Amino acid sequence: MSSHDISWHSPASVYFSSDLDVKRIAGKLRGCWTDLLLRQESCCERVLQKSSSSMDYFLFRLFCSLALASLLVQRADSNEILGLKIPFDPILNANTVCLTLPGLTKKQLDVCMRNPDVTASAIQGIQIAIHECQHQFRGHRWNCSSLETRNKIPYESVVFSRGFRESAFAYAIAAAGVVHAVSNACAMGKLKACGCDEKRRGDEEALRIKLNRLQLEAINRGKGMVHGVMEHFPAEALGPQDSWEWGGCSPNVEYGERFSKDFLDSRETYRDIHSRMRLHNNRVGRQVVVDHMRRKCKCHGTSGSCQLKTCWQVTPEFRTVGSLLKERLNVATLIKAHNRNTGQVENAHHTHRRRANINDLVYFEKSPDFCERDLGSDSAGTQGRICNKTSQGMDNCESLCCGRGHNILQQTRSERCNCKFHWCCYVVCEECRITEWVSVCK
């Protein structure tokens, strides 16, 4: 029997009443065979949308689902059909990552060639950082929009070549994004060079033996049947009398921090004030992730008890990282070059002002107002930006429009609406067009 027969007729014939049903449906889906091999349902979806009746819709969807399930079961054999070699995961090597990634310095290219998979995770971390930057600065005159680079290194953006407060934030959050992404990728087993944090892993076999012993003791004391109860709770809930042991898989934040330093700090080849500012802010960003790692625990034991606690570390939510760095930006310190070439920086304020702390963001160039378009200072201007005339924040029309005033315009946009869940298991939505009045900066 051919693979074609196995994939299409065997699963379907169990559910359809006659060969006529199978032939009719297979005829409509004939052009979808390659799509199904690639585990793509787009072709099936196109046929479903053209279904003439609810019964056809149900039969077509069931047929597609069965065919996909059959292909997954026979994955090893089905990959050979049509001569297709389909990898389970994308292949990450030096050619597919490093040589296709513009903007890398020579040192960064060397780091990438040694660890292309880690570099790919680092780039994902930078993208996450850019999106978080856009969230933190939404409604501000400068809103991180120039940093969006579609999975490329964003350091060619003008803001990275300046010494603004915004530059300090951009460097710090990018470094934090690399630590965050690489550390978690290690724990998820995605990278060859690292795994779980071995310092916080614990002896799994010893924990299993200990739990078995505790359960047997509970049985002997007549405390009921043996059945593990697992509940997650914050480490802060643990009282001083509670004991716990390392278990599970903690993100390898030590490796993530080290790779972030190797990959990003290697861009700096000089010891001028600009390089020192960038190195300092890179370190601040990394440290925010490290300092806000938190413990998460799981309770093991017989029903209603917690005879053994195992804990592991988790990285902070990246929204938390962004908010913490934004708070530090609000008290960032203006610096000037030190007379001695020691690589240190000092604040440019008078002696009675607060000196720069090691955990402060620092900058050396006062920011422009970002009101008018000026590519030399990474300012896109605010003309055409939507403002909120009732807001008390940075997005209020008076502030965002720089006193130029605003127009009231009618805007029409589309969004999904009236979504309904169908058993089983898909959601169908309508597309609604919404017309609203918005305030737009002149």
UniProtKB/Swiss-Prot annotation:
Gene3D superfamilies: 3.30.2460.20. SMART domains: WNT1. InterPro entries: Wnt, Wnt10, Wnt_C, Wnt_CS. GO terms for biological process: canonical Wnt signaling pathway; cell fate commitment; neuron differentiation; odontogenesis. Palmitoleoylation is required for efficient binding to frizzled receptors. Depalmitoleoylation leads to Wnt signaling pathway inhibition. GO terms for molecular function: cytokine activity; frizzled binding. Changing residue 248 to S: Strongly decreases the ability to induce the expression of genes involved in tooth development. Disulfide bonds join 133-144, 186-194, 196-249, 297-311, 299-306, 371-402, 387-397, 401-441, 417-432, 419-429, 424-425. It is found in: Secreted, Extracellular space, Extracellular matrix; Secreted. Disruption phenotype: Morpholino knockdown of the protein causes arrest of tooth development. Otherwise, mutant embryos appear grossly normal, excepting some cartilage abnormalities. Ligand for members of the frizzled family of seven transmembrane receptors. Required for normal tooth development. Regulates the expression of genes involved in tooth development. Belongs to the Wnt family. Wnt10a overexpression in embryos results in loss of anterior neural identity, causing a phenotype with small or no eyes. This is Protein Wnt-10a. It comes from Danio rerio (Zebrafish). The gene is wnt10a.
